[in-house]
Amino acid sequence: MASFPPSLVFTVRRKEPILVLPSKPTPRELKQLSDIDDQEGLRFQVPVIMFYKRKLSTEGEDPVKVIREALAEALAFYYPFAGRLIEGPNRKLMVDCTSEGVLFIEADADIELNQLIGDTIDPGTYLDELLHDVPGSEGILGCPLLLIQVTRFRCGGWAFAIRLNHTMSDTLGLVQFLTTIAEFTRGAEGAPSVPPVWQREFLAARQPPFIPFQHHEYEQVIDTTPDDNKKSMTHKSFFFGPKEIRAIRSHLPLHHRSTSSTFDVLTACLWRCRTCALVLDPKKTVRISCAASGRGKHDLHVPRGYYGNVSAFPATVLRAGMISTSPLEYAMEGVKKAKARMTGEYLRSVADLMVTKGRPLYTVVGNYIVSDMTRVGLDTIDFGWGKPVYGGPARAFPLISFYGRFKDNKGEDGIVVLICLPEAAMKRFQEELKKMTGEHVDGPFDYKPIKVVSKL
């Protein structure tokens, strides 16, 4: 049983999970992952979810059957997804292309779509119902690389949820795969419009390795976090429409309001509120890591159709006390500095660091990672039922927040941010956020120009 909100109770009935295999024979081979793919920080499962309304023109068609068949067709081209990961020497990950298949679950829920989606959306609240964690499937090695659940609602709408082994692809690579499935559901024949490209050697470490950058996101730090910040975590989502973004911008000096991107403004606000909520030692160093793609960078020519990881998490390091007490401009300049570090050369430096340092985990102490998924295309995947009402991240992690696109009941476009914090910290976070998104009276800004200097 699931409850969302507390007054809403619904039941999901699932059939036994099955393995969907490629629709035709595929090569049996070993394929190495890149040195960006197999870093420790990507050895986890990431879920995304899409919701679709009933469509009269597809009456009589079963989304479960349509997607299951199209999935098999797509796996014939993306056959590494049907294999299993193994480790080679020095923990090097590679795919054993066994064609064992991906996990697929058919389900029905006695609820209507509009009961789950309203002025905002909080998929993490009911994700366990719409994406069942099949026992024994959650591992990185020797487990299915994809888990998919298609859930029909009694209104005729339905949900498509998928869990990806992150070492295989980033979200843009996943969208490329989902687009191929969507093409087959809409009757396409032959090869995908964008043929998949493996070529993981493209982001292999150089010989000899060359690390010209300081990678703050991988610095190992002694954990002095208060015990209260290590207790049980709670998940919430927050909607930021034009009104909320305007309110946050009003906390900035005039010259920053029109020149700073929504991502910069929102991320600075969240970082500041989160830092305050965690009640950290003012002298403690904290990091903001902005997940950034290398696709489109002039010094990194990513092959068209490449679906591996092409992302890094460049970070800025500042003092918690300065983030909490300085004007919002201070945190925002830190965000901008982190973003500006991302280049193709920076990504190659990360690959070289992985091999040189034994694939270290990103810093987990005082770090906040944000991943903007508003433009990756999850909200455009059309399986024949039109674009999803929502297509985006399904759950946050303790150190990681995701941004997704969402249109509320008023038709207002905005951003949904998924947050995961200890319960007490979440309450403080909400209080801090109210200060930032409430009415703010404009007045003379007595801020002095702020120069952000990383504190190492």
From Swiss-Prot:
Catalytic reaction(s) noted: 3-(methylsulfanyl)propanoyl-CoA + butan-1-ol = butyl 3-(methylsulfanyl)propanoate + CoA; ethanol + benzoyl-CoA = ethyl benzoate + CoA; butan-1-ol + benzoyl-CoA = butyl benzoate + CoA; 2-(methylsulfanyl)acetyl-CoA + butan-1-ol = butyl 2-(methylsulfanyl)acetate + CoA
Any Pfam family: Transferase
Q: Which InterPro entries match?
A: CAT-like_dom_sf, Plant_acyltransferase
Give this protein's Gene Ontology molecular function annotations: acyltransferase activity
Q: In which tissues is it expressed?
A: Expressed in fruit.
Give me any GO biological process, just one. response to ethylene
Broadest EC class assigned to this enzyme: transferase
**What EC numbers are recorded for this enzyme?**
2.3.1.-
Reading the lineage from the top rank, the first entry is: Eukaryota
Upregulating conditions:
Induced by ethylene in ripe fruits.
Catalytic positions? H166, D382
Q: Which UniProt keywords apply?
A: Acyltransferase, Transferase
Q: What does this protein do?
A: Involved in the biosynthesis of volatile esters which confer kiwifruit flavor. Alcohol acyl transferase that can use a wide range of alcohols as substrate to produce esters. Exhibits benzoyl-CoA:alcohol O-acyltransferase activity.
Similarity comment: family membership: Belongs to the plant acyltransferase family.
Give the protein's recorded name: Alcohol acyltransferase 1
**Organism listed in the record:** Actinidia deliciosa
